[in-house]
Amino acid sequence: MLFRSVRKLLASADGLIENFKPGTLEKWGMSPEELHKINPKLIIVRVSGFGQTGPSANRPGFASIGEAMGGIRFINGFPNTPPPRFGISLGDTLTAMFAVEGFLMALFEREKNNGKGQIVDAAITESCFSMLESTLTE
């Protein structure tokens, strides 16, 4: 019943943002391929700890792990001490911003060019890693 209601909503939606462990939508019979059969214009934003593909994709992830593995915890704190947590959930915030940027770019592409939906993959670890910029060269 719930999935039927969700599918009905998605038939006319511009986008879906999900933050489940990779493979969850597929287990529910709601893979991007299935959802695009219902609505070819649907933009699907998939947020996870490590992305939808790769060796760590099936691992659950959350901000503190993404911050550590993405490297931004390294730049916080003092030498010879473990890196402390940030005062905010920086990994979640960064990933949300990148996810929205991806959604907006997919929406722009859909409206300007082909009329088709896309899949946007936003990973906490990659979002954090992208903030290292000049730190990597030091």
Region locations from a protein language model:
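Short, small-residue-biased leader/transition segments that mark boundaries at the very start
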Residues: 1-2
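An anion/phosphate-binding loop that grips the pyrophosphate of nucleotide cofactors and donors
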Residues: 13
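N-terminal Rossmann-like NAD(P) cofactor-binding subdomain of oxidoreductases
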Residues: 18-74
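Acidic, glycine-rich segments within the central catalytic cores of soluble metabolic enzymes
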Residues: 69-138
